[in-house]
A protein has these predicted regions:
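Amphipathic, small/basic residue-rich leader segments at the start of a protein or domain
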Residues: 1-93, 368-372
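Glycine-rich phosphate/cofactor-binding loops in nucleotide/flavin-utilizing enzymes
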Residues: 2, 13, 333-372
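Glycine-rich beta->alpha junctions and the first turn(s) of the following alpha-helix
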Residues: 2-8, 12, 88, 192-286
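N-terminal glycine-rich flavin-associated loop
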Residues: 91-112
Length: 372
């Protein structure tokens, strides 16, 4: 594989970092943390509208989408670079869900009307999301939500959990089982029951109840398994890339603290126990970086990437746990201050650790692939 970043990767990463650096400050994060929304969560937790608008205006949102939907026809490597920067700044925007998964899937598999929706998402005028998780279902490729074809079109019945930005979404991508096979549908959240869920880092996630809910098929039923695999693969990789950025910045923060904080007349970073924990955290971050880079490169080259993607998500969860706790422990009492920026990075890392499956889930999936 080639570890050399593309020029587009560097440019988009730099541009995303500049936009976030101007708009995502510690005060802004605190403001988002303290925001309170309406009864349905319509104007609530952790959505940074000014940042989303700026990312759209600078072309970041559409850059890695196909030209057919208004993008620059870049790809996975460039999307990974953007997600890494967004994770580094704890950006409260749905780039992964609306652009990578929503617009990306519709651009690739959708009909003309659905591709138009992808174009609007790339321009930032609408938000899309995907409902990939279900309670007590550890196999996202085999959803328990069911789809039935009627004279009036498709109808879905089931329940999805932790659906990001469902309250703001124009449409939700919903995988469901239809006649024993998997298919992917578009659902208008106005026709479903959308309920806010309490999340530690105040990410805007919602339960979505479907009861004979009208839906629109994406692609074909026969191609549904391929479409869902495409979505899940990029969801796992995107989450891992975001976690990489979060852990990189968290490690920078704790390294700065260890250099500046003195105890017994010495910087705490000079003590062997602290230095060893920071060294282990550095190794974890580098391991995750290599895993994410390999998975992204394989996908960009249209090579088999399932094992690499599960490996990256395992590292995102396992290394994320260790690094997040190291950052808090080394900061001492400051680390448990909920008003300190370290708390934001800790909760973000813990959220990324378990989102879309934890380390055990992805080890099981990886083991099944290796056993074939």
């Amino acid at each position: 594989m080639d570890f050399t970043p593309t020029e587009a990767q560097l440019d988009l990463g730099r541009l995303t970092g500049e936009v976030c650096g101007k708009l995502v400050t510690a005060d802004r994060l605190r403001e988002l943390d303290n925001s309170r929304g309406g009864e349905a969560g319509a104007d609530t937790e952790r959505f940074d509208q000014p940042l989303w608008t700026s990312l759209a205006e600078t072309g970041v949102l559409a850059a890695a989408l196909p030209e057919a939907v208004g993008g620059s026809d870049l790809g996975t490597l460039e999307q990974t670079a953007i997600l890494r920067e967004l994770g580094k700044h704890l950006a409260a925007v749905p780039y992964l869900w609306s652009i990578v998964l929503g617009a990306g899937a519709l651009a690739r598999f959708g009909d003309a009307a659905q591709r138009d929706l992808a174009t609007r998402a790339g321009a930032g005028s609408v938000i899309l999301t995907a409902a990939l998780a279900e309670e007590r279902n550890w196999e996202p490729a085999t959803p328990t939500t069911t789809a039935v074809a009627t004279a009036d079109g498709w109808r879905l019945t089931g329940a999805k959990t932790t659906v990001p930005f469902a309250n703001r979404a124009e449409r939700i991508l919903v995988p469901a089982t239809a006649s024993g096979t998997t298919a992917v549908f578009l659902v208008d959240p106005a026709t479903a029951t959308v309920t806010p869920q309490q999340v530690v880092d105040r990410s805007p996630e919602f339960a979505v109840e479907l009861s004979d809910t009208p839906a629109e098929l994406v692609g074909t039923v026969a191609g549904g398994a391929e479409i869902l695999d495409w979505i899940l693969t990029r969801a796992w990789l995107g989450s891992s890339a975001s976690q990489l950025g979060t852990l990189e910045r968290a490690l920078e923060l704790v390294a700065e603290y260890a250099r500046e904080r003195e105890q017994f007349g010495k910087a705490v970073g000079s003590f062997q126990a602290v230095a060893q924990r920071l060294a282990d955290a550095y190794i974890d971050v580098q391991g995750l970086r290599l895993a994410v880079t390999q998975a992204a490169w394989l996908l960009s080259e249209d090579l088999p990437a399932a094992e690499a993607v599960h490996t990256a998500k395992f590292w995102a969860a396992d290394a994320g746990h260790r690094v997040a706790h190291t950052v808090v422990h080394v900061h001492g009492g400051v680390g448990i201050d909920r008003d300190h920026i370290v708390h934001n990075y800790f909760t973000a890392a813990k959220h990324n650790e378990f989102a879309l499956g934890g380390s055990t889930d992805h080890l099981r999936a990886l083991g099944a692939l290796l056993a074939r």
